[in-house]
Structures are given as C-alpha cells and as structure tokens.
Amino acid sequence: MNWFILSNKLRMQHGLALLATLACLTILLSACGAETNVKKGDQFYAIGEYFDASAEYKKAYSRTAIKDKAKRGERAWKLAECYRHINYTAKAAGAYQNALRYHYPDSTALLYLAQAQQKQGDYKNALKNYEAYLELVPGDQLATNGRLGCLLAPMWKKKTTLYTIKKEPVLNGRRSDYSPALFGDEWDQLYITTTRPQIESGEISGITGIKSADIWVSKKDEKGKWEQPASVEGGLNSEYEEGACCFSPDGRTMYLTRCTFDPDYPRYAEIYTSTRSDASWSTPQRLQISKDTLSSYAHPAVSPDGKWLYFVSDMPGGMGGLDIWRIALTEHGMGGAENLGEPINTAGNEMFPTFRPNGELYFSSDGLPGMGGLDLFKAVCDSTGQWKVENLKYPMNSNGDDFGMTFEGQIGRAHV
C-alpha cells in the first residue's frame, strides 16, 4: 500500500477516534454539570428560594440527554414545581407537560397541569386533564372542584354580576401592588403592599426574583383624589419583606406579615404588630401565635368587633395547603388557634381574609369551584355558627389570581 495513502488513513482513524473521545467527554461533562445543577437547585428549593432553584433546574434539564427519559421527567417536574410556587403559570404548564411526556410517575403532575391551564383560561384542556386525573384518583376534592369550575366559568362570563370594576391608575405601579387596606375615620388612607423599584430593600429575592415587598400608603388630597403612594414613615419597613396588613377597630394597632431571610433555613412568614403614635408607626414586634416555629402565619384580619384575629397558616391540624384560622383577642392575651373548617377551608389554599364592617368575611381560595387560580369568596356566618360561602363570580373574579379586598365603610365600594 502506498505510504501516503496509509498515512492519510491512519490520520483519519486517529481523527475519528479523537472526535469520539471529545464527544464522550462532552457528554460526560454535561452529565456532571447537570448533577451539580440539580444539587444546587435542591438546596435552593429546600429553603424556599424557588426562583434561584428554577434557574438551576432549567440548566440541569437542558443538559440531560433526551434518551435519559427518567431524569428528564424528574427535572421537568422539579422545574414545574418552582414555576408553580412563583406563579409563572405558562412556564409551569409547559414544564408539567414535559414531565408527563417523559412519563414522570407522580400523577399529581396531571392535576397541576389542569390547574395551570384553568388559570390561563384554557378550560377545554383543563377539563380534559381534570377528568383524566379523576380516573386515577376518584373523588379527589381539588380535581372535582376544578372540573366544576371549568364548567361554571364560561357561564359566569356570559351572565355577569352587577359589580363594576374601575382601575385606579395612580395606585398602580409597573410592579405588583396588592392587598390594599383602607384606614382613617374617613377612609382617606390606603395602605398597599408593593414591589416597586423604589422600595427600601435593595436585595433581589431568591424566592421571587424581584425585590422584597414593602408597605406603602396613599392619601386623599383636598379634592378627594388619591395621591401617589409613598413608603410608610417610621420603622415599619425593613430589609425583609412586609405586606398584607390590617388594623384594629380603634386604629391604634397594625397587624402585618413579615418574611425574614436566613441563608440556611426555610423561609417562614410571621405576623407582627405595630402601634401608631401621632402620624407614624412603631418598629414591628413579632406576635407569637403558637410555639410551632416550623409553620407560617400570615395575612392577618381583625374582626369588626375586635374580638378575633383571623390569619392564614399551614400549621398542623389544617385541611391541606394554607387554611384560615382564628384566635381570640382578649385583654389578657390570646386564646388558642381555631381552624375555620369546612366549607371555608379545603385541601387547597385559602388566603387573604378580610372583613366588611357588617361582619361579612371575604377571602380567596384555589380549592373551591372557581374560574382559575385564587377566586374571591364571601362567607356569612348564621345564628348557628355555620358559614355560607359564595363565589363572587365574574367580573370580580377572572381566570387569574384575585385576592385582597378592603371596604370603604358600610357603602358598597371596595378596593382589590
């Protein structure tokens, strides 16, 4: 054989071997990188930093070979769970679909996919997936109520209620503004929870990927028009997350939710109190509702008579997810916590309780039949202590999350 031909042949074989080695090395490095990403993601997820965890799981998923279906399915599931927690609904739906495509074994992925589709107003596909899940888990409360919501929502949109919705541009910024609370003898102050860029906390939250929330206030001017909101004066806001506040009937005490940060432990919400002196609020003090330090306590609401503090918690003894609880407020302190039970609480999440001055309780739930996500509900307690719950329907509710109401005295006007 000609030496030149032999030499070229040897070089070609050597080149092919080198390419094969490089390909194997690339696959190996990619697999190792994916495992590192999963490990980091798990660490973030364990302490509730879902935004940071999602970034790691996304890298891990993209670095996992398509033929490795089991790992692709598991990583798609983890990514979907992060997106669900931080309310990235469309991305969550896509990730759950990937998990199911790769035969992830947990059928809950089908339920969560249906919920995400319903939250996007895709009632047809949501209904199909709720029914598929009910074939696997007959009688499941969340799927049963979700299915019913998909059937009711289109009818509610066709036959609307008498509520009129009007946007207040001056009260809304480019970021999230939510959970309003009216204050003052003439309801001329409105406290809101906001994540506007100007808030005091300069840190980006690993939970949400945006700045932590603060409490701001807007006041009415001489013409009765709302002014631009501004940060509450005094020591109310901090480097941590504050929001979802309410007031005692005498206006002397504010109850608020605060989430502190710890790089080594899960994030738990707690309820704090602040007292009013002249025009400013004091530095908040933690309100110990229970000795349980592994549960969250949030979204306080004081009953109109000042005798009860309603709040949201995932403490043991609930019905699943977040439940609404209440605790007696007395001159000697606080009583024991009581779960409101059915028909208010469900296996889903009940949140953002608030009262109308006439004693009606309003709250949001994603476990009762609704249009999608959190819907607003009204609950009235009769003389026997039984609650009657009613969905506020469209246009008060939408396929997205609807929550956080405050009422302007006895008149039929509210901010949400």
Q: Which residue stretches match the model-derived regions?
A:
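Alpha-solenoid helical repeat scaffolds
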Residues: V38-K39, A70-K78, T108-Y112, K128, ...
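Canonical positions in the second alpha-helix
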Residues: A60, N98-A99, A132-Y133
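Short, conserved micro-motifs composed of acidic
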Residues: I47, Y112, K119, Y123-R413
